[in-house]
Each structure stands twice: as C-alpha cells, then as structure tokens.
Amino acid sequence: MSAVEWSILPGLSPYRETLEAMENRVAAIRAGEAAEAIWLLEHPPLYTAGTSARPEDLVEPERFPVHVAGRGGQYTYHGPGQRVAYVMLDLDRRGRDVRRFVTALEDWVIATLAEFNVRGERREGRVGVWVVRPDRPAGLDGSPREDKIAAIGVKLRRWVSFHGLSINLEPDLTHFEGIVPCGIREHGVTSLVDLGLPVTMQDLDAALLRTFPQHFPD
C-alpha cells in the first residue's frame, strides 16, 4: 500500500480517543493491513507533555487538561483554531532516518507557510518553525523577535511514525501562557491570523495537501 490516505476530521477531536485510534492505525500500517495516513483535525483546549517535559514548564496545571503524549519534545498546547496534522508514515519503506524525517516535516510546514507569503524558518537546537517579527520589540541583546508558528513532535513504533505537527492558524494565543511552550522561555508564539493574514482552515488544508508530495514522495 503506497497511497497516503488523508482524513479531515470535523469538530473537535477528543485527545485520548484520537491517540488510541492513531495507535491502532500505526499497528495496522506496520502489519500491512492499512495505508499510510494523515489526519487533519482540531482538539479542544489541552496541554500535552512530551518525553522531555519538565514539571516547572507547566505553569498553570489547572487551566486545561494535561495529557502525557509519549511523543518527543516538551509541553505544547492544542486547541481550536490550530491545525493538527497526525502523520502516520512507514519509515521502513521511506528510509530509516529520524533526523531526515523531522527535517522533512519542518520543510513541509515552511513550504505550506510560503503559500501565504510567510517566511517560516528553522533554528538550530529548536525543533519547529519560526517567524521573525520585525514589527515587535527586539530582544535584550538587540536580536530580532522570533515567534513560533508551528510545533513538531513525533514518535516511532517499529519505524511507523505517529503524532506529527501543529500549525497555529487562529488559536487563542493566551492559552499558551499556561506552559513554557517546548521549554523555550525567551520566544513567543504567533499564528497566521496574528500575522495579519485572513487565512481559513480550508485554505491551510489545501496548502498542506499541495505541498506534501514535494517532501514525502511515494
């Protein structure tokens, strides 16, 4: 099975049930019983803790439900207005290179943002995608402000990937205040709408679909 099956889920997907369904799909892919899959969805407001999450980075533990995700990375927020892409690909077939896979995810996000004339950038030592904010005050050292627009956190099970990435379209950015996103205190978060772009979720999904084959060819 080589074609990737795409699903766009309506409404808000409950986290625990979605994680269980994702784990079942990963097992089916590994067994050769199901095609690779990408699920595009939104969650209700919640925080997830990756395998490197530090207790002190959960600033407001009572604000939203907190889930242990089992993916790589630290704390992140999911909620309405944020597009989550769960990426279930067979790296045994595509190449057993985790670093290359994460880089391809970043490149996919960067290409998607470019569809809206947004320059997303990667940073050494900071997984995810960032945008420079010349419209915001510079840092104490005079360096330009950088805000995170997309987070990436993955897990592999017998070389099938799951979890994936999230892109901030129009979430309530104050919801990120309950955590230190990805353990990075000196940078903020942004979204496409925060950048002044009237992008819809349908626009974003279409861009994700268009740019995917460039970075994950069959």
Curated annotation (Swiss-Prot):
Site (Lowers pKa of active site Cys): K148
Pathway(s) of this molecule: Protein modification; protein lipoylation via endogenous pathway; protein N(6)-(lipoyl)lysine from octanoyl-[acyl-carrier-protein]: step 1/2
Enzyme Commission numbers on file: 2.3.1.181
Subcellular localization(s) per the UniProt record: Cytoplasm
Protein keywords: Acyltransferase, Cytoplasm, Transferase
Principal location class: cytoplasm
Annotated catalytic residues: C182 (acyl-thioester intermediate)
One of the record's GO cellular component terms: cytoplasm
Pfam family, one: LplA-B_cat
Catalysed reactions, as listed in the record: octanoyl-[ACP] + L-lysyl-[protein] = N(6)-octanoyl-L-lysyl-[protein] + holo-[ACP] + H(+)
Domain BPL/LPL catalytic: 32-218
InterPro entries: aa-tRNA-synth_II/BPL/LPL (IPR045864), BPL_LPL_catalytic (IPR004143), Octanoyltransferase (IPR000544), Octanoyltransferase_CS (IPR020605)
UniProt GO BP: protein modification process
Remaining remarks: In the reaction, the free carboxyl group of octanoic acid is attached via an amide linkage to the epsilon-amino group of a specific lysine residue of lipoyl domains of lipoate-dependent enzymes.
Entry similarity comment: Belongs to the LipB family.
Known function: Catalyzes the transfer of endogenously produced octanoic acid from octanoyl-acyl-carrier-protein onto the lipoyl domains of lipoate-dependent enzymes. Lipoyl-ACP can also act as a substrate although octanoyl-ACP is likely to be the physiological substrate.
Protein name per Swiss-Prot or TrEMBL: Octanoyltransferase
Organismal lineage: Bacteria, Pseudomonadati, Pseudomonadota, Alphaproteobacteria, Rhodobacterales
Gene encoding the protein: lipB
